[in-house]
């Protein structure tokens, strides 16, 4: 098992060897989970240095069914440092997939063990070991960090890509190296013999000026200049049944299974198989299937070149023109027909920005001439106006669906025959899939799209609250093509990397009439301010100077060595002073200080996040966390944001719908006001309207102490994700549920309310070949009965525990700022904790006390 040596060892510490009760080789059979057992090979063993502290890992102690004592040599020390971890503790969702009480997968605050420190005089000191405090899980959910412990490897600097031998970040985006430079370059020249029928017997080299070095001479006969290759072509290689595709390139850019002599294979990937025969009837963004044996290759070569296959066969490229069973290669028709493609709005005939996909009969992606043929989905490696559905931040995936964004018109090179076009523009326009036959006479293709859901006309505008890295103009194109009226482009800091900082000016709204646009699609640059453990916060639309520092407290958000000098709550207050909107991004993670920010009333909205996945829907984990705040009376609106950081995520995959004041013109300011009111819903496709006694989401209704009945009216519709059920959520539980048709439905319920409550609408749906998801969710309507505020004791306790965790992190392993800043931040957290704690006392709710809230009268 690998040892960890993350730096030199400090002489101020020494290992304390002991005899454990389980050998590492036997750990899998010691009652641990199968997930932990599968990870044993990665567990550190032997001599280790972690954060500069030496450890010796031998037999381990499994603290499970009985107490285990270990002995070591008498040692006088001020500190003992433990290297330990814990197994996973599954979280079991209840009805509807929701979790209550919500402590997270890390089981925040749960007492995992007690450690008793034994002294030579027979006395002992006992310490409770709590999850996400003194110990974490061996495999944690992102954002659920420890407050008083650190991971086994200390943070490390990483060389910029251009400082590494390979890959070279910028140059690799070109996907080509001319290879015409270096310490020594020989040049090749081809001379055409005017008398090929005559024999050549030698060459004499005569000097004239300077020095020439001739290294070699070669002779041959080909049909044309041997150093001139033809334009790019495509072919399909069929592999043997027992052989998979090997995509790796060697240092010379060569594949292992197919190479060219007088030419070069440009790219190779498993062929994508689309449902071409039923293309018009399949759904938008549906992923293709990856062929198990066919590899689509691009190449450029001399007409007399040959392919060399892994089994030793040599295939002249001239043989590809006619399919032969004995040859595992087949040529594809070249895409040489230049066509103008336009997408127009039905009725007006106006060209409109859209998302576009085109492929040929063999599944080959056909990009416009000014777009990437091979889009790059990796994190921060490409900021192009492309979308690679099915990819991840680190790879294109097995079956990517390539798309791009166009302003309504583009030039594209197409092959003869059938090509398959997909056009989409948001959630209110019906997506189009159509087949087009390309002939020598084809010069233009026109695709007409139709708006069928009138939510914009009803006053609703759409937004993505969380986009990174794009330029403002690229964001404007992608937003308009996706039907997203407001794109919030967020500058931030990532260690030593600053992004979009130069785009922030605190005043410009791109696309607005003041900025020369039509005012229908807007881009505003804000900031995402972050701390790795305490959390992230999005500051939108604020005016004036950038709120800096944008990150604090060290990696992987701010630079290594940065202290914690400001809290999320303080950033939020500054944003509001500058007229901005405060959103908690990718809620609920990181799960720490945002509890204090919500309790303090400094947050306008919580963000449900997609991260590129079109099929997972709104995460019940996220909703469960949101519900506990609603259950305690904290009305915070729901918004949707993608956290787009690469081409694997489309702007608006999940989006916010917010209804403007009927008297207000659409502006960025009007949108912020709508979110502050809470008249919003979040969706992956289905659209909704929802009122309680005529009051929209974000409203508060007062009822007498006797309670009463409220009328709930709703309407839903979708032209993208087919709907399956509509549910009424009351205080985090499903009160009503009804099956609905996939395209449109409406209904009403009469609901008895005997105590203070919140009500929200949830829509489920799914494509025929996908599992059901939560596809849309409204912000709530709050109902107060007899003036009694909502306060669910079990949820309130978990909120207090989360604030206590933030305090513990600030007090222990968080890099300490100067004393004044530390005390200021601590007061902010303590004040939030006391606010909720005092509410519990006022209500007479029984709860345990921690050192933060302990009172003498409780003993």
Name what the model sees in each region.
Residues 222-224, 603-615, 660-668:
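Acidic, His- and aromatic-enriched active-site or binding-groove loops in soluble protein domains
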Residues 220-223, 331-338, 449-462, 683-684, ...:
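Short domain-boundary/entry signatures in modular proteins, especially
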Residues 245-248, 252, 262-294, 299-327, ...:
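C-terminal functional module detector
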Residues 153-182, 375-409, 505-512:
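Surface-exposed acidic, glycine/proline-enriched linker/cap segments
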Residues 1-297:
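N-terminal/edge-of-domain interface segments
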Residues 89-91, 135-136, 210-213, 224, ...:
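Flexible loop/turn segments at secondary-structure boundaries
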């Amino acid at each position: 098992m690998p040892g960890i040596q993350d730096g030199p060892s400090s002489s101020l510490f020494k290992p304390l060897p002991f005899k454990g009760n389980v050998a590492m080789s036997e750990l899998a059979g010691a009652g641990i989970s199968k997930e932990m057992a599968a990870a044993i090979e990665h567990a550190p063993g032997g001599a280790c240095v972690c954060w500069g502290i030496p450890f010796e890992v031998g037999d381990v102690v499994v603290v499970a069914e009985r107490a285990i004592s270990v002995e070591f040599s008498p040692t006088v020390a001020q500190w003992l440092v433990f290297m330990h971890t814990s197994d996973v503790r599954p979280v079991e969702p209840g009805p509807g997939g929701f979790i209550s009480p919500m402590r997270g997968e890390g089981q925040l605050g749960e007492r995992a063990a007690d450690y008793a420190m034994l002294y030579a005089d027979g006395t002992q000191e006992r310490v409770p070991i709590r999850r996400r405090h003194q110990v974490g899980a061996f495999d944690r959910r992102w954002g659920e960090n420890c407050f008083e412990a650190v991971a086994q490897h200390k943070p490390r600097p990483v060389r910029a890509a251009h400082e590494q031998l390979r890959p070279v970040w910028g140059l690799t985006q070109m996907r080509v190296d001319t290879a015409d430079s270096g310490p020594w370059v020989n040049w090749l020249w081809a001379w055409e013999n005017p008398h090929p029928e005559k024999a050549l017997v030698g060459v004499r080299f005569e000097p004239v000026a300077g020095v020439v070095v001739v290294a070699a001479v070669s002779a041959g006969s080909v049909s044309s200049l041997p150093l001139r290759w033809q334009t790019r072509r495509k072919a399909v290689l069929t592999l043997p049944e027992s052989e998979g595709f090997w995509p790796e390139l060697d240092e010379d850019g060569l594949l292992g299974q197919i190479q060219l002599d007088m030419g070069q294979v440009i790219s190779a990937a498993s062929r994508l198989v689309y449902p071409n025969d039923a293309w018009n009837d399949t759904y938008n963004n549906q992923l293709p299937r990856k062929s198990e044996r066919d590899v689509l290759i691009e190449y450029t070569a001399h007409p007399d070149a040959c392919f060399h296959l892994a089994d030793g066969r040599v295939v002249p490229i001239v043989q590809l023109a006619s399919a032969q069973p004995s040859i595992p290669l087949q040529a594809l028709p070249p895409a040489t027909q230049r066509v103008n493609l336009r997408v127009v709005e039905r009725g007006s005939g106006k060209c409109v920005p859209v998302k576009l996909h085109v492929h040929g009969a063999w599944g080959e992606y056909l990009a416009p001439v000014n777009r990437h043929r091979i889009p790059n989905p990796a994190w921060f490696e490409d900021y192009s106006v492309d979308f690679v559905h099915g990819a991840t931040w680190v790879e294109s995936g097995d079956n990517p669906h390539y798309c791009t964004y166009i302003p309504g018109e583009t030039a594209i090179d197409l092959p003869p025959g059938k090509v398959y076009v997909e056009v989409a523009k948001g959630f209110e326009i019906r997506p189009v899939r159509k087949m087009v036959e390309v002939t020598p006479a084809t010069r233009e293709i026109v695709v007409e799209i139709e708006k069928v859901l009138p939510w914009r006309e009803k006053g609703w505008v759409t937004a993505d609250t969380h986009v990174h890295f794009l330029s403002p103009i690229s964001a404007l194109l992608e937003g308009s093509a996706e039907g997203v009226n407001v794109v919030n482009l967020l500058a931030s800091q990532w260690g030593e990397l600053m992004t979009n900082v130069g785009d922030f000016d605190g005043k410009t709204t791109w696309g607005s009439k003041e900025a020369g646009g039509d005012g229908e699609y807007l881009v505003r640059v804000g900031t995402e301010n972050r701390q790795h453990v305490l959390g992230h916060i999005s500051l939108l639309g604020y005016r004036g100077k950038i709120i800096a520092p944008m990150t604090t407290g060290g990696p992987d958000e701010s630079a290594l060595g940065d202290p914690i000098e400001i809290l999320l709550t303080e950033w939020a207050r500054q944003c509001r002073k500058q007229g901005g909107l405060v959103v908690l991004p990718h809620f609920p993670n990181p799960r720490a200080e945002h509890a204090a920010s919500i309790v303090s009333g400094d947050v306008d909205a919580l963000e449900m996040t997609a991260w590129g996945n079109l099929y997972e829907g709104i995460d019940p984990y996220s909703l469960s966390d949101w519900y506990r705040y609603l259950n305690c009376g904290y009305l915070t609106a729901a918004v949707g944001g993608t956290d787009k950081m690469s081409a694997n995520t489309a702007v608006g995959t999940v989006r916010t719908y917010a209804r403007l004041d009927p008297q207000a013109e659409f502006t960025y300011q009007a949108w912020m006001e709508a979110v502050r009111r809470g008249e919003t819903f979040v969706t992956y496709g289905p659209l909704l309207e929802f009122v309680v006694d005529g009051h929209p989401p974000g409203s508060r209704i007062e009822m007498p102490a006797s309670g009463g009945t409220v009328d709930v009216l709703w309407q839903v519709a979708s032209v993208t994700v087919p709907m399956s059920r509509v549910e009424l959520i009351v205080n985090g539980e499903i009160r009503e549920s009804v099956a609905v048709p996939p395209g449109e439905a409406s209904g009403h319920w009469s609901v008895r309310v005997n105590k203070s409550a919140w009500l929200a609408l949830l829509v489920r749906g799914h494509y025929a070949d996908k599992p059901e998801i939560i596809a849309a969710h409204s912000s709530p309507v709050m109902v107060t009965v007899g003036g009694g505020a909502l306060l669910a004791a079990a949820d309130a306790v978990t909120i207090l525990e989360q604030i206590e965790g933030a305090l513990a992190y600030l007090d222990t392993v968080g890099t300490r700022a100067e004393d004044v800043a530390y005390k200021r931040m601590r007061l902010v957290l303590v004040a939030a904790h006391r606010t909720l704690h005092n509410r519990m006392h006022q209500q007479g709710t029984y709860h345990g006390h921690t050192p933060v809230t302990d009172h003498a009268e409780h003993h």
